Amino acid sequence: MKKNDVFASYAVVPPQAARNPEFYQKRNLPIPTLSVVSENDKGVVISGMKMLATSAIFANEIWIGNLIPLAPDQVKQSITCAIPCNANGLSLWMRQPLSNHYDNQFDAPLSWNQDETDVLVMCDKVLVPWERIFVKDDAIQAREIYFKTPAHCYGNHQSNVRYWSKMELIVGLCYKVAKATGADEVPAVRETLGKMSALESTLSGMIYGQIENAENWPENFKTFNRRIMYAALNFCTDNYSMIIDELRTLCGGGVFQMPASIKVMKNKELLNDFETYFQTPQMNALDRMKLFKLAWDVVGSEFAGRQLQYEKFYAGASFIIRNHNFRETPWNHFEDVVDKVMSKYDVPIKP
């Protein structure tokens, strides 16, 4: 991949409706979950669906795998492989791009070029050569490859860093929006800004902790600290809605006061009114509009809605993330702490 500069996406979750195979079996319907349907000297043939391959329409390759546990008898669904995006029988079903709604970046600064299209991968008798297969006929190993190796840790450390970068943008927006209205001088608003700063700093500390307290695992390798990484993952998915709501509150009705489009600048009469009445003591009209258009793309646009859904579920539902944390916790250590305290006292002896 490095040598050929390959851009790859991945699809490692079965479609929601396919998680109840009995429904399809009772109706004599094919189960939508991607599985091996046949094999020959050249490789295996796969059919079915996987979700969601983010940015797959721009990718060279798609990694097909299983991040959700399989039943031991689901050996045909356990296939883990890589397929090129131009493979015969492969189709990519994507939602409508959000950037289609706009004709310039000023009115939708993030929607314009930051939308990551979500793709459902459908295979119709796709031939996968043997050399492109990593796991076959092993329902347990198909998932364990992510946790018995640093794969899941490395991928989600990057997710933590990505989230931190977004957090810096949101905290910056909180401060600039407050300054744009003069609200940054209000003690209650400063409390909110301090809270946002503390949240950003907490995440940065967790990321540095993953690096500074890296593990010697597997043998002869360094891996980001898994326990701290999963704790950060839990922090990120738990707090995104609240973080966005804080920015939303600071924006107030300001995001609705702006003209519908920057095209107002092309009309001299409208431009004069805009520059006169939309300015504030803290900011001129154009800069204020530019700021609030960006803030809206973070808190209220269709792009913002997709981001909210993504940040809550990209690593799985909350119970999945917390089970990762459970798995990495040194419970024996915590039990020992309790036992040491209890060992220092006993049933009192009556005088």
Each language-model region and where it sits:
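FAD-binding core of flavoproteins
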Residues: 10, 15-159, 327-350
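Alpha-helix capping/hinge segments and adjacent helical runs
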Residues: 227-351
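Short, charged, amphipathic alpha-helical segments
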Residues: 187-194, 222-230
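Charged/polar positions within long, soluble alpha-helices
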Residues: 13, 179, 205-212, 241-248, ...
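Short acidic (Asp/Glu) and glycine-rich catalytic loops that position anionic groups and cofactors
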Residues: 148-155, 212-222
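Active/binding-pocket-proximal capping segment
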Residues: 210-219, 257, 261-264
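Hydrophobic alpha-helical hairpins/lids featuring a short glycine-rich hinge
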Residues: 1-8
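Extended amphipathic alpha-helical segments enriched in small hydrophobics
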Residues: 158-216
